[in-house]
Amino acid sequence: MATWRRDGRLTGSQRLLCAGLAGAFSLSLTAPLELATVLAQVGKVQSHSLGLWATGRRVWLSEGPRALWKGNGVACLRLFPCSMVQLAAYRKFVVLFMDDLGRISQWSSIVTGSLAGMVSTIVTYPTDLIKTRLMVQNVLEPSYRGLIHAFSTIYQQEGFLALYRGVSLTVLGAVPFSAGSLLVYMNLEKVWNGPRDRFSHLQNFANVCVAAAVSQTLSFPFDTVKRKMQAQSPYLPHYGGVDVHFSGAADCFRQIVKTQGVLGLWNGLTANLLKVVPYFGVMFSMFEFCKRIFLYQNGYTLSPLTYKLTPGVDQSLKPQELRELKKFFKRRKLHSKTPPW
């Protein structure tokens, strides 16, 4: 039976690989929607006023179909270091919130996850900035030829701190994001009329999608300002295509509200929300597919296509323990076949 909870039958590296591959597939599938979101946030060629279809069509006709996946390679590459840092940070933070019995509350779990995510985002922030720069540039007349070239060019032209432009918005945006997650998860039992540990897989999937949608909606203004700060550069054509001129984060908020109204802070939200269901749907499906392969490889199941358990195998054993047990019985079997003379 599939489960979204942590499975002790997988090694740490196997779980990381499952998460990385699932994330890469999800990002690749929803990359055109992510592009539409970022273009609307930055204000590139007034993409927020065109609509999703018109934005995609304009990019396709002017730059080619490959342009719909601009920046996706960098987004996929940063998954593994980001996941590793987030996991390490989570293990450190979770100890601080545990009670004497080693338990952690729902609120503490959300805060711990948010803090770990914030740390991983800050550590890998230069790759996020470069991803934005690659997405807003024209692939036919690129200012950056890839991750390494972009990193080197930005560092030489604008200095090291330019790679962290807008990072403060990540910290500020974590507050409404965590509040949105808490708001959803605190009301799950009322909505489903049952305890969390009895939720079905479909209910868990719906919970994740709703929590993501609410959290991202509340924190979206901070993400919009961050994208504008990331894209803006005097060394790029038209200052990176940003639709407002500003001198900092606070001024960027003011200029957006002044020129576009308060709703201008949510430009691109529709595309962002449309990618929630396919993103998590593909992520969960791909994670379970990879998980089945590793469970079969580790000897817990009879086939990589199903969750049918291997008879006689203790499913509570960890992979290393199961391997040692198999070696023990193999040696014992060989010893029993050896003649006494």
From Swiss-Prot:
Leader peptide range in chain numbering: none
Parts of the chain that traverse the membrane: 16-36, 68-88, 110-130, 166-186, 205-225, 262-282
Keyword flag Repeat: yes
Record's keyword annotation contains Nucleotide-binding: no
Membrane topology: Multi-pass membrane protein
Renumbered ranges of Solcar repeats: 11-101, 105-185, 200-298
Any one of the GO BP annotations: transmembrane transport
Keyword vocabulary terms for this entry: Membrane, Mitochondrion, Mitochondrion inner membrane, Repeat, Transmembrane, Transmembrane helix, Transport
Subcellular localization(s) per the UniProt record: Mitochondrion inner membrane
InterPro entries: Mit_carrier, Mitochondrial_sb/sol_carrier, Mt_carrier_dom_sf
GO cellular component: mitochondrial inner membrane; mitochondrion
PROSITE patterns: SOLCAR (PS50920)
Family named by the database record: Belongs to the mitochondrial carrier (TC 2.A.29) family.
Protein's name in the database: Solute carrier family 25 member 43
Species name: Mus musculus (Mouse)
Source species taxonomy: Eukaryota, Metazoa, Chordata, Craniata, Vertebrata
Gene name linked to the record: Slc25a43
